[in-house]
Amino acid sequence: GAQLLALMGDRVPRAMLSGLPLQQQWSYRSTGDFAPDYYLETDADLYYYSFTDAHIAMTYRALTPQQQARLDPMITGFNPADMYAADHVRRVLTTFPGVFTGLGEFSVHKEFVSPKIAGDPPSLTDPALDRLLDFAGEVGLVTVLHNDIVMPFTPPENERAYLDELKAELAEHPN
């Protein structure tokens, strides 16, 4: 928090503060004593790291009210393919009242990241995402969603593979 504010200086009046939602698994069978800190350094899975939300909240609470006024903390430690995602967000809001402004940035279709995530990959057509977005709309959470429009190595006829799904999802959840 304080480091970000120092970096912002006087030129940036306000910024979004998000934790990293995915953690690279350190698989000894894959990398031995080398602890990977980037998703391309190993073939091991990525997993959703829910502690990131508590870390952001505690960091934010340690700031002065003037410093807090310049930051918008966001919830990111949920799996958008999990029907429990909305419940996780509700629990974070209850545990840290008044801290969080919204959700995100979280990814649904993200080129080389999505295939590395353990479990079901997020999808724009997943009811879990609908449930999450419905809850965000009900409680007034700003939502920042990252969704690639194209797939890697897409043939020209499928160039914008996810665009129609994205438009439909946004139309279904206008709030």
Please give the residue ranges for each predicted region:
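Catalytic pocket-lining loop regions of alpha/beta-barrel enzymes
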Residues: I117-N175
